[in-house]
């Protein structure tokens, strides 16, 4: 029975393939190969290196799931947004597979995929507020009853996750910065350093992390010798201020929209400090908090496969001749 969808994710520095049963939503296969160690020496993702590593990793993963090929009904792939050369690696493989197996091709928006990480084994729920925090994006969305997405707030500059990476790089801590900063902050012995919460007195429903990032840079310059204790203290102050900023604007949004359900997605949503604060906020406003499983917060192909199930039902197919590469976020107004 041809009821399986194979999905490919390669938008940044994770090579991933998943296979899902479109009828039961059962995950039949999922594998991810991370490039974090390869990019860590550079303090961030190097696009050309990422593309080369994708071209090596994706075929290796594909060989591990070829037993399912006979039951495939479609091929899905992340086509936007992301690094052009990384996206192209996955798209090229997807088109080759779709052509060779004579299957329909389904392009999936990466951010929609993150939203579906909340509903990997269940039907998607509408009328829900969503905080998306990742290395490339910070936004608050409202998924309405009619499946339209309303953007309530976004960042004017750096994203939440990106700011963690950049602060980690300033202190020569490595990449990715999210986990490094979070773990370092837990070891802070002193807590005398503080930073101002960005846009604290602004009515604008927006985020901005560039000023906070610069404040951290200036704090680092004050210290001739950046000891481990000082690094931990800076990490603690930065993480808490970044989370304060997220929560400050979220509280204003909650007051306006009175969410009954609220979800949190994206790689940076794995931050335990942020998760704890979100739980408190939802309790305060009697909202049900829905969290993506920690394993599937970061980029993965299973969320792309899950999004593809609904896209398959709507017959959102494209020709393999069509240019579907879209590094910018163009198709993100409706689920």
Swiss-Prot record:
Binds 1 Fe(2+) ion per subunit. Gene3D superfamilies: 3.30.420.40. It is an enzyme of class 2 (transferase). Keywords: Acyltransferase, Cytoplasm, Iron, Metal-binding, Transferase, tRNA processing. HAMAP family: TsaD. This is tRNA N6-adenosine threonylcarbamoyltransferase. Its cofactor is Fe(2+). One of its GO terms (biological process) is tRNA threonylcarbamoyladenosine modification. One of its GO terms (molecular function) is iron ion binding. It catalyses: L-threonylcarbamoyladenylate + adenosine(37) in tRNA = N(6)-L-threonylcarbamoyladenosine(37) in tRNA + AMP + H(+). Belongs to the KAE1 / TsaD family. One of its GO terms (cellular component) is cytoplasm.
